[in-house]
């Protein structure tokens, strides 16, 4: 029986009996029945029912869930078992490369991690804009000058408020420009980044049912205030609202909207067009992708693309480019990142799982028995698939990137010497591509291991001024040194570069695409002839020489040479075709490449800063012996997806610009501030390339950030333009909105003798606010006084009992009616001149040490009799300078916005459908088979 059924029947039985003992017996029986059904466990689904049943009836129910056995002790760190586990785990974590000699894994165990913050492309159309100046209703006051008649409230009016500046503190007054910058950054982070509206909150116009009201942009508040028809103050406004409307044009895709906005909000909406996400038409890129994939595929769009469909632009940040020129470490990190991206794209599965069969055939041909423990069997020991793949990837990457080759592995056996002889033919050996030391080492290896012993010459030892064996011996003929071998050495000493497959379109972003300068069809090409010459000459010399092999028996050596000649000369053509097959296809997306620049032409010193890539010496021979099938057909879907990923990465890298812009502006405001510290504290790296900035040594980073060209590039960015425009708007807004009520004023007029109060606006009875300081009064800027400039002039005005104005943001101390009733310091300040700005501390320093705090008096209460206010607060010597309140306009302004859907995408491949029409054989673009048996 099911557990839930048992519980239900037990409930019925328990309710049927009266005594508690009988209830407990039935309950215990129920629990034992459930446990017998479920191996001593109570199922989770019936446990709450049982607990509830026990609580209701006051029964005892004890149940402890069975815990699974767990090992509490930590494993013994010295135990062999746990060490093996750790070793396996770390090997699996990330295998960097295989040491082809020992077949051991070199394992990369990270010792520190960089947290990446992905860039979320947050699409914010214009209707998401939250207005900074809100609206509120205020009532005018009609003051009475007679005690027996109280003040009256007049008409209502709708005003803009200034709550956006209610967060300025005393510390921010000292550094007001930084406050404005922080405010601008805050606004920039929420500013719309699409220059159109995608939806509107609308409602029927209650004052004209044929029209529509827009409730976005804070307009709902305005319509709510004037909706009270009993309030006759707004009669004129209600008549104006009749003409408010939203007109949508379906052909031009625009919307004309009636809005009442504060000038500050209007300015910010104008700045939106500078803040848009950089994009490009999707249809153009779709067409490009279709053309690229036309090799063996038909790519058709899955659906029709609207004319407003956009794709994020392929932006190449000039700031990143300049950073790469300044920091070799950053440049190498970026190149390495690009190289890692390319690795999965190459089609290199041309090897069988093992080269042992080919090696066995060669050994059999050389009549070597494995029972003979002679050095012959180790001649090809370092030849394996791992080194073949590693070398092939290096060759392919060498066509797109420029890096240094560092040959590794055993360099003292027959196999590596034959392989080095092939390397000197296939790899680019010119000075721009291969360093002199590497070239000399390869030449010396070929000479000492293959040529010297065979032609009966002494082995070559490097000396000053004579470092290359080929140069030393190329002109010394005679003996067994046949002209075939000399022809090979001459050809190698030409140091031939690779041919340019495609020139770069921007050498600061991508380098030329190069390919081996070897014909893929003509077997009489110089390179094949040179290899043939070498082997013919060696075979000829070995026949005349009774002891031609250095470590190998003479017969075996001669036969090894013959079999090597067949393998090497026949397999170079498939290798060249394989390289061209890969490169000519990947070059189709050259326009979408990641960063691959080689900055040697721009900065010659970068020759030593290239990446150094380890190449197994035996790799070329491994390829020659192992290549035995055609590669897979090219997968255009993955290649074009790679182009999408690169575009997204470049877009993410651009996020670095905004943080550098903010650091630069902060430094412009106060040059003593560190740009480096700000960047390191606030950077949220989106890619591992940007994260590598934090690994730069401190002093190096400081000097990089001081670079004039880098700073100029930062000043040319979109982010810099937007931030500066917002700063100007915020500064103008501060000057033109009332802020005294938030504890901050534009300045203060200080008088030697208290003067009578005035009334600044109709919304207060009395206050000490002035909108315009009197003409002819000397002005002092707060920033000057804080720096000690013109302080003596200010003291001079005090001594001469002359009025003066301090302009600049000043903190005010509001004194309300309650403070006035008890005679406080506010009363004293009113009647003692200059007290607000002259302190003994300032006199000692000869400058204003702390920005002065001035008093702000305001009385808006209509209940107080007239004389009561006059007696205490009739005069003051401090007047606060502030801006008048802004009245919301009667008639709406019509704004025209584009009206369309958000159709911004980061991926193009998803919009295409790929249909394969490839031929059964893998061919080059000229129709030649890549591999033919």
Swiss-Prot record:
GO terms for cellular component: T=2 icosahedral viral capsid; viral inner capsid; viral nucleocapsid. InterPro entries: Rotavirus_VP2. It is found in: Virion. Keywords: Capsid protein, Inner capsid protein, RNA-binding, T=2 icosahedral capsid protein, Virion. Coiled coil: none annotated. Transmembrane segments: none annotated. Inner capsid protein that self-assembles to form an icosahedral capsid with a T=2 symmetry, which consists of 120 copies of VP2, with channels at each of its five-fold vertices. This capsid constitutes the innermost concentric layer of the viral mature particle. It encapsidates the polymerase VP1, the capping enzyme VP3 and the genomic dsRNA, thereby defining the core. Belongs to the rotavirus VP2 family. This is Inner capsid protein VP2. It comes from Rotavirus B (isolate RVB/Human/China/ADRV/1982) (RV-B).
